[in-house]
Regions:
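ABC family nucleotide-binding domain
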Residues: 1-141
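H-loop (His-switch) and adjacent beta-strand-loop-beta switch element
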Residues: 138-150
Length: 150
């Protein structure tokens, strides 16, 4: 695949949740979720975004900017954004890395719930062995190479 084809594949089939959220500070929670949908030409971007923000417990925080949201709330906006585009596969890089224990547990619960409800393949990258133990399949890496399948 050339670069344009890879970009199309990523935008149509793949979702991402980053450790540092990657929210645009000048956009509200709602606008952060809507943006990739609008770029993809989704007709009901606003409605879909509102539904997913409600599903992650942020239905009352739609018009808040990232700087006014806690770390857990920002991560939930990122999760709503990722799932709203209905990806076939979702990559989550240390989804609880910047969160306290309780908030992290809530984010993990939410990720797995949406994973099941939406039928999305979820690929987690984590150093958290307890989180890894909840996954159906586990792989370890060493020096950038697949080292072991558990």
């Amino acid at each position: 695949l050339d670069e344009d084809q890879r970009a199309t594949l990523r935008s149509e089939k793949v979702g991402f949740v980053f450790q540092n959220f990657q929210l645009l500070p000048a956009l509200t929670a709602l606008e952060n979720v809507m943006l990739p949908l609008e770029l993809a030409g989704t007709q009901d971007a606003r409605e879909k975004s509102e539904v997913f923000l409600a599903r992650v417990g942020l239905g009352e925080r739609l018009h808040h900017y990232p700087r006014t949201l806690s770390g857990g709330e920002q991560q939930r906006v990122a999760i709503a954004r990722a799932f709203a585009s209905a990806p076939v596969i979702l990559f989550a890089d240390e989804p609880t890395g910047n969160l306290d224990t309780e908030t992290g547990a809530n984010v993990v619960r939410l990720l797995f719930e949406l994973n099941i409800e939406e039928g999305t393949t979820l690929v987690l990258v984590t150093h958290d062995t307890d989180l890894a133990d909840r996954c159906q399949r586990k792989f370890t890496m060493s020096a950038g190479r697949l080292a072991e399948v558990l």
